[in-house]
Amino acid sequence: MEVKTFLKRALKEDLGHGDLFERVLEKDFKATAFVRAKQEGVFSGEKYALELLQMTGIECVQTIKDKERFKPKDTLMEIKGDFSMLLKVERTLLNLLQHSSGIATLTSRFVEALNSHKVRLLDTRKTRPLLRIFEKYSVLNGGASNHRLGLDDALMLKDTHLRHVKDLKSFLTHARKNLPFTAKIEIECESFEEAKNAMKAGADIVMCDNLSVLETKEIAAYRDTHYPFVLLEASGNISLESISAYAKSGVDAISVGALIHQATFIDMHMKMA
C-alpha cells in the first residue's frame, strides 16, 4: 500500500468524523510536543512519521534517525503545530513509532544473537494484513533482510504444493520455462532425503524446515560436496537461544517469522511543552 494512502487510512481510523475535543476547544494555539522513550530500543518509523506530520501541517523540529538506539527518557522527536492537530495525530504517530520500533528492536536482538556476518537473517510473509510493507521496512531498520514480499517474488514450493507434484525434476523444468528469467525456485524440505531430492531436481534454494541443528548440518555438508551453488535456508521455530547454533550449521540464511509476529510495542509517550 502506498505510504500516503496507508497514513490517511490510519488517521481516519482514529479520527472518525472528527475529534470531539476540537468542538469544545475555545481557541486554538501553537504548541510544542515531545515524543519520548519509556524503554530502550532501536528507532524505526521515521519515514512514516515525517510523512504523517507533513500531511497534517505539523513541523518536525528534530528527530532521531531510523536504526538509532535510544534509552528511557530520550527525546525521539520534537514537533510543533496547532494544539488541536497535535492531539489529533498523537495516537496514530505513537502507534506507528511504537510498532515499527518494536519490530526493529526485536530484530536487532536476533542479529546480535546470530553473531555472524556470513549468514543472513530474513523475515517471512507472516505479517499483519495490509501492513506487510510497513513491517518489513521495520525489519530492515533492525538490521535483517527481507524474504519474499509476495507470491510474485519467487516460486516457493511447500508441502501443500508438493503433494500434487508427481515428478519434481520434470515440474521444475516446466516451471523454468514459464517463470521470469530472474525468478528463483525454493523448495521447503522436512528431511535429509527431501533436501537431497530438491537439489537433484534443480532447486535454487533449499529450505530446511523445522529440522534440528544436526540434521541441518548434514544437509549443508551434502550440499557443499555435491551442489555448492545451491543456497540453504534454515527456518521453523528458531529462537534467540538457538539461532547461533543454526548459524554455525552451514546455511546461508535463517528466516524467522517471530521478528514480526512476536514483536511488542516499544513504550513511548508524547508530552506537551
Spell out what each predicted region is:
Residues 234-235, 240:
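Structured functional modules or segments
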Residues 269-273:
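Active-site loop ensemble at the mouth of alpha/beta enzyme cores that anchors a bound cofactor
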Residues 210, 236, 258:
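Short secondary-structure boundary segments
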Residues 223:
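Conserved hydrophobic residues forming the short capping helix/wall of the S-adenosyl-L-methionine
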Residues 1-190, 194-201, 205, 217-218, ...:
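Acidic/glycine-rich phosphate/pyrophosphate-binding loops and surrounding catalytic core
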